[in-house]
Amino acid sequence: TSKGLGAHTDSGALERWLLPAYQHVFANVFNGNLAKYDPWHAAHRTEVEEYTVDNTTKCSVFRTFQGWTALSDMLPGQGLLHVVPIPEAMAYVLLRPLLDDVPEDELCGVAPGRVLPVSEQWHPLLIEALTSIPKLEAGDSVWWHCDVIHSVAPVENQQGWGNVMYIPAAPMCEKNLAYAHKVKAALEKGASPGDFPREDYETNWEGRFTLADLNIHGKRALGIDS
């Protein structure tokens, strides 16, 4: 049994209205030029600092795509990913709190340092648009725009394994290189990196994976000159 994961988008919530970089990203939305808004225009997204507190469960890197790779077969009703496959739906989410039926002290469930929630109460049309991806076989991979609304369906009668890995597309840029250096420092100590809870399971492990065990690809990913 799994409660699933409610509909949301990642990479900041209240921050999408407040941060100057996000105000550039969504300028055409806020200025009323919706026809000119291009969710694929990535300029200024690498300048966003949406999560500045370490050791949460929020991803602070810039992701062109979020990715879901199945480690087991995944069937309908067994925790499949659901999406609203319309990146432009972010415009609806951003403008929704400004409509007349929303109290002045309410932002449709939004809070700082969290994911951006999408709910039946405030976004019924978007909830209605949530669509399941097809069944997956182990090894299949699914990718979606970083603004796409997504959820994971609850499971009441689990049939076999249901395992996936979240693997984003995180291109090299200053923002991601800064995080890579944090991961390098954490690996040297055997500590949990910044976007994960401070659990530090491996700190005292003998024979744990170290920087010396990295191949050329691992070194490049952590910004280490090979």
What are these regions (language model features)?
Residues 1-121, 127-134, 138, 153-158, ...:
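Non-heme Fe(II) oxygenase catalytic core, chiefly the N-lobe of the double-stranded beta-helix
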